[in-house]
Amino acid sequence: MGGDNAPACVVEGVIDALRESGNRFEILLIGQEEKVAPLLQQYDTGALKLRFVHAPEVITMEDVPATAVKAKQESSLVRGLKLCKAKDADAFVSAGNTGAMMAASLFVLGRIPGVLRPTIYAYFPRLGEGLTNLVDVGANVDCKPENLVQFAEMLTIYQRYAAKIEQPVVGLLNIGEEEGKGPDYLKQAWKMLQKAHEEQKINFIGNIEGHDILAGKATIVVCDGLVGNTILKFGESIPHFLGAIFKPALEKLVKEGKLDQNSAVLAGQTFKGIFEPFDVEKFGGVPFLGVDGISIVGHGRSSARAIKNMIYMAEHMIEQRVNERIAKMLA
């Protein structure tokens, strides 16, 4: 029941998912009864496949992840993952503390056999259709070459079956396209990725550079978590930055008589449309790839729409047996 807008937006998202889907799955809503019960009373839930599970403790955004997971065993986060571990639930979704989600997922669910380190990716828009996934974006700051290879392999499985990308394309983020570029660990990763390509596990096109991410040269861009998280946070700042300078510039043109009000409104609408590809709420969240269960985390500011779409993502991963396919590939 985490997130900046919880629990109201979580309850709304759950209700929307059940109604929109025609009740094709059951949802266990986990949280503090005294806060959730009044919200549920606002909806007609009688015909919905919805059960409530009381969890008295809360892991906040300020909590130290590993410490909080151990100390707050009765939190919605830990209780939800334990339900998955016990096979009483098939997936867990939350917009709570990402670090705590990652720590709890690994602690409670463990790793898929053969996985060295679970990972997390991010969405980036690209020229043309579709999206680019950047992996890793903070789960693994210090990576070995073999970690980068597994990230590419796991995300290839996810894209192929869950995202319906027929032929995912893997690029290794580096300071140049040539094979011998970059530090030793990237040179080794290149060789190992090329071997995986030859074994037909992935479709590896070699090194790519930063400008290739938005250009759409690859559907999967592999890097360590430090680089990935830095790029992610920079990318998240772009719409806000451009919006902050665009609005005053537009107002100045109107004030100077160089642009009429109607044209300014149209320009503003066009500007908003440009950044529609940056809207990740259409996907809801991202799964932790490599943990032995389905654990999906959304942005802390997730809306009801994002919660609903995270639920659909979980359903799709279950149907496509993504984790089973990852385990089979790594066996």
UniProtKB/Swiss-Prot annotation:
Chief localization: cytoplasm
Nucleotide-binding as UniProt keyword: no
Annotated coiled-coil segments of the chain: none
Pfam families reported for this sequence: FA_synthesis
Enzyme class (EC, first level): transferase
InterPro entries for this protein: FA_synthesis (IPR003664), Phospholipid_synth_PlsX-like (IPR012281)
EC number: 2.3.1.274
A GO cellular component entry from the record: cytoplasm
Catalyzed reactions: a fatty acyl-[ACP] + phosphate = an acyl phosphate + holo-[ACP]
Keywords: Cytoplasm, Lipid biosynthesis, Lipid metabolism, Phospholipid biosynthesis, Phospholipid metabolism, Transferase
Presence of keyword Lipid metabolism: yes
Localization, UniProt: Cytoplasm
GO molecular function: phosphate:acyl-[acyl carrier protein] acyltransferase activity
Annotated pathway: Lipid metabolism; phospholipid metabolism
GO biological process terms on file: fatty acid biosynthetic process; phospholipid biosynthetic process
Summary of subunit composition and partner proteins: Homodimer. Probably interacts with PlsY.
Family: Belongs to the PlsX family.
Described function: Catalyzes the reversible formation of acyl-phosphate (acyl-PO(4)) from acyl-[acyl-carrier-protein] (acyl-ACP). This enzyme utilizes acyl-ACP as fatty acyl donor, but not acyl-CoA.
Protein's recorded name: Phosphate acyltransferase
Organism: Chlorobaculum tepidum (strain ATCC 49652 / DSM 12025 / NBRC 103806 / TLS) (Chlorobium tepidum)
Gene this protein is translated from: plsX
